[in-house]
Design a protein with these regions (language model features):
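Conserved SAM/AdoMet-binding glycine-rich loop
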Residues: 14-15, 23-24, 127-210
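Proteins enriched for Cys/Gly/acidic motifs involved in redox and nucleic-acid/cofactor modification
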Residues: 1-143, 187, 193, 197
């Protein structure tokens, strides 16, 4: 797709952004058709990076090392024209290191959004007519494990349920381990929660998982 973009318009600026750029930086550097390489946690700086490129026209790679601690990259949503459902990302990264998965290397370690930051975004969207909120993350079950205190995903959901204008709350993919009796009981007390789960089941084969 990157090569096709350059072929269709030789003067276009081609930027590889996200997971591929994060894990394949050295390979992309060898490709003369790629002008910019922008990894995860630098997406919010896309416009300044492009402006810098247009000033000097130098090929560049903006890729942070996510193998150690780094801050959550906030990409806030202010308005959703003619939509009443919003996807709210509350967490990034994963510490699981499953044998078949590249996510911890591409997305880095677990980084959770501050709870008040999440609630502030939801309040703003609710004021603008959003009524349904889908809570997502790369490994959303781990929300809060890297923050000070003992607040986790269920605590966040309970607080979202208190926000005026929120009619429905849904969850993105979960790992089965989080579905405990206490977790389900507390969910039952959140009237807006839609009573179904999407569980991530990669494989039932021990040999594959090893």
């Amino acid at each position: 797709m990157l090569h096709r973009a350059k072929k269709l318009n030789p003067d276009t600026v081609v930027a590889a952004v996200g997971c591929y750029a994060q894990v394949g930086k050295e390979e992309l550097k060898k490709d003369p058709l790629i002008d910019l390489i922008i990894g995860n946690n630098k997406k919010k700086d896309l416009i300044p990076i492009l402006e810098k490129y247009f000033e000097g026209h130098r090929r560049d790679a903006e890729v942070l090392d996510l193998s150690s601690g780094s801050e959550y990259e906030a990409l806030h949503v202010r308005h959703l024209n003619e939509h009443t459902r919003a996807y709210i990302k509350v967490q990034d990264g994963c510490n699981q290191f499953c044998s078949y998965c590249i996510i911890p290397y591409a997305r880095g370690r677990v980084r959770s959004r501050d709870m008040e930051d999440v609630l502030s975004e939801i309040r703003g969207l609710a004021r603008n007519g959003c009524r349904e909120f889908v809570i997502t993350g790369i490994h959303v079950c781990s929300y809060g494990t890297d923050l000070d205190g003992d607040k986790g995903l269920i605590d966040l959901l309970e607080e979202i349920g208190k926000v005026g204008g929120v009619d429905r709350i849904r969850l993105g993919s979960l790992e089965p381990g989080i579905i405990t009796e206490d977790f389900v009981k507390r969910l039952q007390s959140i009237e807006q929660f839609c009573p179904h789960f999407h569980l991530s089941l990669q494989s039932g084969c021990d040999a594959t998982l090893k």
